[in-house]
């Protein structure tokens, strides 16, 4: 019987890390071709792909997937197990054929300053989450969320407007 094989994914040399970045269990993350801002914290089992950007003073909790084309501004909280997508037609083209690299297109997604994303959220390609917005745990975000609003549910529906003083003032 074979033993357990452990493969550690190093942090790629083409990653730009700001000052004071804390990566918990760096042998259990996969970062390549991305930018991470000053004083950001990244948990275990996080993947951040090329051409993704995380701002300053963010917290990215464990088991989170941040794909190519995602921009996360400063002071954002991302809960455990959050998944971003970047392709409107995953696995198949519009006519149903399997995609190749030639017809795959990254659709940018943005999370604005001070937003908070609960655990288990799925954020579909092309969505903008507004400044100071809060996304409830387990939501599937299919449309933009305005600044300072709550969104929750499956699919996510807009809830109440938040006070503008709930956004960090950095």
Model-found features: residue ranges?
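Flexible, glycine/small-residue-enriched loop-and-beta-strand segment within the central core
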Residues: 2-16, 23-127, 154-155, 160-163, ...
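C-terminal/domain-terminus segments
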Residues: 127-144, 148-150
């Amino acid at each position: 019987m074979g033993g357990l094989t452990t493969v550690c994914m190093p942090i790629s040399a083409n990653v730009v890390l700001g000052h004071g970045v804390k990566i918990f269990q760096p042998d259990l993350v996969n970062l390549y071709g991305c930018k991470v801002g000053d004083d950001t914290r990244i948990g275990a089992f996080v993947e951040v792909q090329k051409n993704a950007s995380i701002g300053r003073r963010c917290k990215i909790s464990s088991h989170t997937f941040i794909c190519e084309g995602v921009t996360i501004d400063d002071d954002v909280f991302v809960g455990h197990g959050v998944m971003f997508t970047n392709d409107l037609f995953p696995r198949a083209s519009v006519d149903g054929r399997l995609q190749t690299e030639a017809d795959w297109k990254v659709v940018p997604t943005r999370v604005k300053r001070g937003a908070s994303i609960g655990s288990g959220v799925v954020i579909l390609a092309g969505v903008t989450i507004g400044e100071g917005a809060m996304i409830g745990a387990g939501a599937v975000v299919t449309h933009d969320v305005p600044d300072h609003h709550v969104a929750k549910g499956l699919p996510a529906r807009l809830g109440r407007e938040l006070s503008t003083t709930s956004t960090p003032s950095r």
